[in-house]
Amino acid sequence: MLDRSSRPVPGNNASGKHRKSLFASFLSYYAPQKHLFILDTICAIILACIELAFPQILRSLTKGLFTQSKDAILGSLVFIAVGLVVMYFVHFLCRYFVISWGHIMGARMESKMREDLFDAYERMSFSYYDRHKTGDLMSRLVSDLFDISETAHHGPEYLIIGLLEIAGSFVILAFINVPLTLVLAGIAAVLVVFNFFANMHMRGIFKENRMRISDVNTQLEDSLSGIRVVKGFAAEDHERKKFRASNSAYLDSKANMYQAMGRYQAAISGMMGVLNTVVLVLGGWMIAQGQMQAIDLATYALYISLFTTPIMNILNFTETFQKGLAGFKRFTEILETQPDIQDAPGARDIQITAGEIIYQDVHFAYNNAEEVIDGLNLHIESGKTVALVGPSGGGKSTTCALLPRFYDVTSGSITIDGQDIRSVTQHSLRSAIGMVQQDVYLFDGTIAENIAYGCPEASEEDIALAAKRANIAEFIESLPDGYDTQVGQRGTRLSGGQKQRISIARVFLKNPPLLILDEATSALDNESERAVQESLSELAKNRTTLVIAHRLSTIMGADEIITINHGRAVERGTHDELLEKGGIYAHYYQMQFGGAPNIARR
């Protein structure tokens, strides 16, 4: 089907709603951690209260107790010490909880988001992966979610502690000296305004930085996945140049980011220096005028730190917040993207009674491009083996990809036993179809785990029987670790024929009524091809089977051979019938078995 991914494009009025929706979505991840969040909040409040209390305690003692007699002071020191020890022990416990369990809360939220993101990736249709780079998707799963986790933890901590300390210290500062506090508030307002505009500038820089690290991840994933091709073409220098180009672009964006951060931090520090200078000079003038006591200025200086430090923390946190916000936006973009292929409302499980497949006037195009399938009509009878041949790009693989709904038809219909495949659930449809492809993918794990992929409940006996039917059991049993042998990522420790037969064993174990064999032997040597072909012949018995093959020797015995060209069925018949027609199939046969006569393509 054409691209139907739904991404909201908010206008001016929708922008606010989108921000609210984004905020509500973010808050929803706190819900499972609400008890931890409440405790974290309580500890943060206690920390703020203790921080605010100490300068006031010092001021009271200096103005009161410490002006009394020596005996009075010494007699009270034990009680003061005990009180402060208790207070700072509570401070220690709360600080430990906020730092450790606050981060654990963020990590749990990150873990849940990572699961949700992976689930979203698994839901996406093939067309989504046709449009997106793997490195970018990996970056969202790792880098973005780490930044979101930091925001989830430090956001409430800095806001709760910071706002309490700012409000509390401001009230106390005003209580000590109103004019000086108004000056302080004015300078703080300049700090906030400066921070607002600086963040607007840095937001674009952070976004650029994320794009560059995604490019690095994509280049790395591409080079490592294709390392055998790289080595085979001695193209290491070429790959190094490509990687260094993307890495250099990332370095430039990161240098730009750090320069912006440096300018920002330096400007903030300069403003803080101005603030301290103004307070000290103005406070000294007030002391000289008899409008303020020296102890009040000393206490005032302590509270300035309590007033400005949380402001600095909150302003500095905006860097983390910007990264987290950018990451969460990218995160929600994926969660809100609807897969192109979805179950219809009320979709039922497919019921395979015979295995008859009908393509009726099927049209298909990739992403609004030129049609690949153009009015295709096929009738594949139950239990028959039908081979599709034709030129590369003629539509053979696309024809097979439409059957399990990896893509949806643009128009027309495909039915199995009279059931339109769009009216049944994807899970039941794909469970009814077994696929053996040219490019076999084995997962990092044991041979047994790979054979049982899709059937994790299979017993050892079932796995061994499937391997035997696929003509791979003897080889597996000759290995020191047998079925527990590690295959390596993508099956790198096995030959092409061995991997192919393991993939066939998978399908034997799955035991589906429908089968698709897509160039299953084209990459094998003659000996491996014979072994695999025997396995495939056994596999195709009593199943409706679609076969794609360029090696005509593998499909001569098919019940019917259909030539696909330009997305249409242009010839059909048995091997002998098509040779007699002298058409495209006969031309291919002559090229493979009787030389390559100069016959125009039909």
Locate each region found by the language model.
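Helix-loop-helix
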Residues: 67-69, 73, 172-186, 260-329, ...
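Membrane-integrated ABC transporters
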Residues: 1-51, 66-80, 98-102, 106, ...
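Transmembrane helices of ABC transporter permease
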Residues: 32, 36-49, 87, 154-208, ...
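Transmembrane helix-loop-helix hairpins at lipid-water interfaces of multipass membrane proteins
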Residues: 37-94, 174-179, 290-294
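ABC-type nucleotide-binding domain
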Residues: 350-602
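Helix-loop junctions and hydrophobic alpha-helical segments within the transmembrane domains
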Residues: 117, 121, 230, 331, ...
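Juxtamembrane helix-loop junctions of ABC transporter transmembrane domains
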Residues: 11-19, 42-43, 50-63, 87-134, ...
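An intracellular "coupling" helix at the cytosolic face of ABC transporter transmembrane type-1 domains
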Residues: 32-35, 126-127, 143-152, 156, ...
